[in-house]
């Protein structure tokens, strides 16, 4: 994931900052507790494709 891209893109729900989770290949919105998948290195920034973070994931 290109870190320059992270400076440009935002959460499609709240327009907040996204954080990259390399291990899970997801972009995380801490404000909405959502994780957006990366497929073949391409962010899928659709609310319908996002998963809700677990309580443990939200804390970290």
From Swiss-Prot:
HAMAP family: UPF0434
Record protein name field: UPF0434 protein YcaR
Gene Ontology CC terms, in alphabetical order: cytosol
Signal peptide (UniProt feature, chain positions): none
Gene: ycaR
Lineage: Bacteria, Pseudomonadati, Pseudomonadota, Gammaproteobacteria, Enterobacterales
Family according to the record: Belongs to the UPF0434 family.
Gene3D superfamilies noted in UniProt: 2.20.25.10
InterPro entries linked to this entry: Trm112-like (IPR005651)
Stored Pfam families: Trm112p
NCBIfam families found in the cross-reference section: PRK11827.1 (NF008806)
């Amino acid at each position: 994931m290109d870190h320059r891209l992270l400076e440009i893109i935002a959460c499609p729900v709240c327009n907040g900052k996204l954080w990259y989770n390399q291990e899970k290949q997801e972009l995380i919105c801490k404000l909405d507790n959502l994780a957006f998948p990366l497929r073949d290195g391409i962010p899928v920034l659709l609310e319908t494709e996002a998963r809700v973070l677990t309580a443990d994931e939200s804390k970290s």
